[in-house]
Amino acid sequence: MGNARKILIIDDDDELRDSLSEQLSLHEEFDTMLAANASDGLKLARNGHVDLVLLDVGLPDLDGREACKLLRRSGFKGPVVMLTGQASDADTILGLESGANDYVTKPFKLGVLLARIRAQLRQHEQSEDAVFTIGPYTFKPASKLLVDSGGG
């Protein structure tokens, strides 16, 4: 799936993580990468091309909001959608202020999550931070650059 959007799912709930991966993979537009904790997720985000991150707030090794801040500091520009069991306005504000683009409360309907993922990806593609991979090339429309992955 060369044009599939890479979604990184960082959640310590094995069942939810695997179920989300399975459901997203049914849609040919998505390809998933999985991590059970923040440190593994941050490594995957830094080392691979990731289009969007689904990030649980309650991770075993680090609060998801702190993980989001670290993602942003490391240069990740793509959308981050926080997943949480806490529905208060204060939690939503903390999540968005940590650098998240959206905040989804568990339990959620898959159709709603899919719509939010697609909306975030559409919005990001129109931003100055958008980067598209075309075969061995990386295209940065805002700076009008087409870069060969070999460095040229």
Predicted regions and their residues:
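A structural micro-motif at secondary-structure boundaries
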Residues: 133-152
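Acidic, metal-coordinating helix/loop segments flanking the phosphotransfer/catalytic sites
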Residues: 34-52
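Two-component/phosphorelay signaling modules centered on CheY-like receiver
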Residues: 14-33
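C-terminal output helix
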Residues: 104, 108-117
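The feature encodes the CheY-like receiver
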Residues: 17, 60, 88
